[in-house]
């Protein structure tokens, strides 16, 4: 549905306003700003927080439930999260590998093709997502993809700094956040 709310409402309040998670299931992830924001897990462990947040919150807090975050642009910026016109809520039974592949293919299709980084980058991202979803990558290949110096990070950095428009800067987010926050889900797709 469509809901217009004031800044400052919590994620939990918005989801409750919209009727909750279908079937009363448990929250797995949220895509703030749709696929542009990637997938944020329901619970963010301290190690996943931006450094500026780690300095602000007391040391005894080890995790944050994203349902308790206030939906305000400045607050989301502190958390390095995007806050756009919509969110997608995923229950525990959602297959985020499948969802990421759908997002990557969407960006590949939506790329106008004018700039090389986006045209080639979005195609490469969709290819990697397809290889992942089809179980053609080994566990070590998947682990290499997820590193801070791996090919996905390098591609994302190149796209962000050289793409003509915003599409090229956000296209890697679904795959990057999937690899970062949901490694157990990704490993299920690894080739033996």
Give the label of every model feature segment.
Residues 1-192:
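Redox cofactor-anchoring modules in respiratory/redox and cofactor-processing assemblies
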